[in-house]
Design a protein with these regions (language model features):
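Long, compositionally biased
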Residues: 104-109, 116, 163-164, 171-173, ...
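Acidic/His-rich, divalent-metal-binding segments that scaffold phosphate/diphosphate chemistry
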Residues: 1-60
Length: 181
C-alpha cells in the first residue's frame, strides 16, 4: 500500500481535521522512531501504521481497533499492518498485544503525542522546538490536563519498550521537532 492509498482510505472513514492531523503526527513520529531504532528500511511502513492506526475511531469509536481490522481485511491489506494498527488498542478495546518494537512504539506514542500537543498549545511559543521534558512531566502528573490522554497507556508503553518515561518523552519531543514548528 502506498502512502497515497493509505491517505485515501483514512479520509474515507475520517473527516474531522483533528483526527486527520493526529494521524499525520503519529505517522511522522513513527517514521522518526523507525530511523532512530535501526528500522530505516521500514520507515515508510512504520509511517503507514501510524497514519492508519485510528482508521475506525471517528465512525466506530465503540469498536475502535476491531472495525479497522475488518475494513483492512476487506481491502486485502497485509496482516502485519492489520496486527500493528490493532495492537495499539491492547488492554483498552482489544486483546491483541504489541509484540514487535514498532507496535510497542505506536502503543506508547499515540497517547503521548496528544499530551505533548496539548502542552505545546499552552506554551507562549506554541512550539515544540523549545519544549522540555520537565514541562511535559508536570502536565503528565495533572490528571485533569488533557484528560483524554491516558497516562497509564503511556507508562505501559514505556515499560513495554524498556524505556524510562523521561526517555520516551524526550525521544517523542525530538521526533515532533523534526516536522513541527
Amino acid at each position: 500500500m502506498t502512502r497515497e492509498e493509505a491517505w485515501e482510505l483514512l479520509t474515507e472513514y475520517n473527516k474531522e481535521e483533528f483526527h486527520l492531523e493526529h494521524a499525520q503526527i503519529v505517522e511522522n513520529t513513527m517514521k522518526y522512531f523507525a530511523q532512530k531504532l535501526g528500522y530505516g528500511e521500514e520507515k515508510e511502513f512504520w509511517g503507514l501504521v501510524g497514519l492508519l492506526h485510528d482508521l475506525d475511531f471517528e465512525q466506530y469509536p465503540e469498536e475502535h481497533c476491531i472495525k479497522s481490522q475488518e475494513i483492512m481485511k476487506e481491502r486485502g491489506l497485509e496482516e502485519r499492518l492489520i496486527h500493528a494498527t490493532a495492537s495499539h488498542g491492547y488492554a483498552i478495546t482489544i486483546d491483541i498485544e504489541p509484540v514487535h518494537e514498532m507496535e510497542k512504539v505506536l502503543y506508547a506514542v499515540d497517547e503521548l503525542t496528544g499530551l505533548i500537543g496539548a502542552v505545546v498549545l499552552m506554551r507562549p511559543s506554541k512550539s515544540v522546538q523549545d519544549l522540555k521534558v520537565k514541562s511535559v512531566k508536570k502536565k503528565f502528573k495533572s490528571k485533569n490536563f488533557a484528560a483524554g490522554c491516558s497516562r497509564e497507556v503511556i507508562q505501559r508503553g514505556a515499560d513495554m519498550l524498556g524505556w524510562t518515561l523521561d526517555d520516551l518523552i524526550a525521544q517523542t519531543i525530538e521526533a515532533l521537532k523534526t516536522f513541527q514548528e
